[in-house]
């Protein structure tokens, strides 16, 4: 299973690291797993969530609405 470091995920999703941190801190994406080296690793599924967030934002949804949608689906 593929995993991304924070910088790799940010680049793949065309976001900056601060945005990933914001999304993580606000519950839009699950927290990264930390390895013994202290690096944060995200599973590949996180990229799918980020792509959905991007599409939903482009469609006019707020981050609050997106978070509520994710909560309803879980």
Predicted regions and their residues:
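Basic helix-turn-helix/winged-helix DNA-binding cores
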Residues: 1-71
């Amino acid at each position: 299973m593929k995993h991304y470091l924070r910088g790799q995920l940010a680049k793949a999703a065309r976001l900056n690291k601060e945005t990933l941190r914001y999304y993580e801190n606000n519950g839009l994406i699950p927290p990264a797993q930390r390895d013994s080296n202290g690096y944060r690793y995200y599973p590949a599924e996180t990229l799918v969530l980020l792509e959905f967030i991007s599409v939903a934002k482009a469609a006019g949804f707020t981050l609050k609405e997106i978070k509520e949608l994710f909560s309803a689906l879980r």
